[in-house]
Amino acid sequence: MAPSLFLQVSSAKVPTVSANNPLLQSYDLPPFSAIRAEHVQPAIEQILADNRVAIEGILQSQGKNPTWAGLVLAMDELNDRLGAAWSPVSHLNAVCNSAELREAYEACLPALSAYSTEMGQNRALFQAFEALANSPEAAGFDVAQKTILEHSLRDFRLSGIDLPPEQQKRYAEVQSKLSELGSKFSNQLLDATQAWTKHVTDEATLAGLTDSAKAQMAAAAQAKGLDGWLITLEFPSYYAVMTYAHDRALREEVYAAYCTRASDQGPNAGKNDNGPVMEQILDLRQELAQLLGYASFSELSLATKMAESSDQVLSFLRDLAKRSKPFAAQDLQQLKAYAAEQGCADLQSWDSGFYGEKLREQRYSVSQEALRAYFPIDKVLGGLFAIVQRLYGIEIAEQKGFDTWHPDVRLFEIKENGQHVGRFFFDLYARANKRGGAWMDGARDRRRTVDGVLQSPVANLVCNFTPADSGKPALLTHDEVTTLFHEFGHGLHHLLTRVEHAGVSGINGVAWDAVELPSQFMENWCWEPEGLALISGHYETGEPLPQDLLEKMLAAKNFQSGLMMVRQLEFSLFDFELHATHGDGRSVAQVLEGVRDEVSVMRPPAYNRFPNSFAHIFAGGYAAGYYSYKWAEVLSADAFSKFEEDGVLNAETGRAFREAILARGGSQAPMVLFVDFRGRAPSIDALLRHSGLSEDAAA
């Protein structure tokens, strides 16, 4: 739990000793194309050394009577310089992974972890922050400044500031090892994903697949110097087989390879096995929690979250499961009945996607593939920008002539009343050596520097969509459109902040179980006729989504929503239970089985090793926090219900949401911000209604 105070990821303007290392230069946007693996470690070591010297100077001048500018802003400058170098390295490691860059990245992790712990356990620094918090000056601080001091003192305690020296030393060792293991988990998953392919030479094997999916597979084969088609475990390829392939044996083969990645099972059993890595991570997290006086890592994780206790989280998840499970059982029964009609009497995990899509097509006469033609990327982006321009009063324009890490990357600028607000990069398409999934990271924070200059924010928005092929633009499925809106919601949270203090601007300082509110909130416009009118248009003719197709799509919105809900609750409960009960003698697999007994309606085969690829909790920020998606969905659904009342493109309500939620970042508790916008505490009713799981839906 590195203190947020000490590793803000941002940009910098501190002079440097090296004229040749791009990571040690001052820059507006990172010089991505100039960054080499050999630059990484020397730059990070130099900055850490410089920062240590600078902190000694800060403590000498601020030890007795600290001031905001002399202490907090001075520390911001140091954090910013470190972030300016580390952010592009971490980003490139995720989107352009290579053996050399990976080695350089990993070589820095122990030093960064040690520095973070050292800062968090620096008693003189802690005392300076404590003195500032108790000073007469602090009485006049604004709410954001007070929150930063409160978070800082909390983070010192969560870094072991109160521990005796031996335990502090052990804390540092555990944090360093956890940093290394998280990276190892991620690397082994990426390597396992890349390690399996299936070369197909008979097109009949691919019966049922769409032309676009086959074109991608042909391109993948060509890239390896092969004829025919190459199936990979990158998500667009996997999804295409599981959803459309008529060949049941092919579906089973690809499913088995995908769900056993980085495990002791499947075609590459024992290679890149994340099983031992998970056990080590769980042991160390439990040790960390106990060092800091918490019963479990779940309890420790809640120290920085909106939820008040483990019991509250578990009650919330179990209540949702109880409400959802009857709907899920009904969904599964209908799917099994349909599959049996089609000649599949024993529905298995590799059949559910295929028959689910066929049942959706039969019931609603709509398929993801038919919809794809209406969502060319530029139309979707134009509509997305039009929606947020109308809601939030901003302008978005594409920029040219910038340094990049790949030719597909695009850069956009946000302005308000002609004034620069921030910029964001889009890296939208799947490719080799790029981490799977979709994410936003804040590449630079909005903040007022020690010189009084306002630094504007920058965000990286990354997805893994199917790229353009054979002269067509990239065409998105509606699911991909929703993913784009989700990540853009995160981006707006980071970019539209009005807070000028780095510690709580944008997504900084936001409780993890509230951070998904703006992202899940944005998804709603993908399901509203007014939103769809702006983001859809046939890629050849430009004609809007036909009314009948629109109606079918909206009717199909909650198709199998019970199954989808219990699947997410399975992930959430598994994660929380795993961290709450570690050490009770149960294995990871046994915890998962227990959760499935409680909430699941369909069991995967015994060889399934889903946890081995659950990067969110083993290599991301969601450990004992995956429940945050559902927790924040209650907030986002209820917030959106205000737009349902006022009009989904109502500018006044949009401005109110911006000012209450987006503009204020982590400067106040999420519940305070929510109540400011909604006028009351959140209710679960909107989530149940939006998901088709309310009593009305059952009637």
Task: Report residues per predicted region.
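C-terminal, non-catalytic "cap/extension" segments appended to globular domains
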Residues: 6-9, 14-39, 46, 66, ...
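Short pre-active-site segment immediately N-terminal to the catalytic Zn-binding motif
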Residues: 466-485
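Active-site-proximal, well-structured secondary-structure segments within enzyme catalytic domains
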Residues: 144, 148-150, 177-180, 187, ...
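Short, hydrophobic/amphipathic alpha-helical patches that form generic packing surfaces
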Residues: 80-91, 150, 154, 256, ...
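Alpha-helical segments
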Residues: 9, 15, 456-458, 478
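N-terminal helix-rich structural modules
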Residues: 5-9, 13-209, 643
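Short His/Asp/Glu-rich catalytic/ion-coordination signatures at enzyme active sites or charged loops
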Residues: 24-39, 89-108, 130-173, 232-276, ...
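Intrinsically disordered or highly flexible coil/loop and linker segments, enriched in small
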Residues: 49, 53, 57-64, 68, ...
